[in-house]
Amino acid sequence: MSSNRVLLLAAMPLLGAALFGQSSGQEMSHADHMEHRFDNAKELAKRFDDPARDAWQLPDQVIDLLRLKRGQTVADIGAGTGYFTVRLAKSEAAPKVYAVDIEPSMVSYLGERAAQEHLSNVVAVQAAADTPNLPEAVDLVLIVDTFHHIGGREVYFRRLAKSLKPGGRVAIIDFKPDSPEGPPKEFRFTPEQIVSEMSKAGYTLTAQHDVLPRQHFLIFAIADRPSR
């Protein structure tokens, strides 16, 4: 697989397999998993935005723990159909939200959804192969169920650091090894593995929240910068 193809996954949308699991009888190769495409946004929205997800995703608690302030800016990388993007935009802090995705159909869908819901603080962003293409530095990067799809993570997160404001944070939410939902077992991480990888990329863990039953919830800052 080429390096560009691996990095293409840095802003992949939430995966159907990741959200709803894969039976133990199925086998998926590393290449198959990493190269899966998601170009039917309207159909995927039925799964990604299923209200039943709220019971284990706990979006309101997640947003409360992000402790956003008015006037701040967020990048939702791998925004998919906007599950967190829309909730962030409608939250009390009402931050500006860059809804970032690699799939053109997702980006179009996000733009249309923002317009339909009159969310002037949402901007849909088409990611490139090796960068989220953020138009400005942000206070928070949120990466939900996408970390395990990012190829060349050390390089990617070092580049991402340039898009963080001083005191900026990166919040990573991804599936636990024993979650009933999620990607194949080989694509799941322990918190220690995520912390180790982020440390190599120049980040330090500033918070770990154990409120989600099926996912890790870790927050990082640049190691040599103070966190907010």
Predicted regions and their residues:
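Conserved alpha-helix/loop element of class I SAM-dependent methyltransferases that forms part
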Residues: 54-72
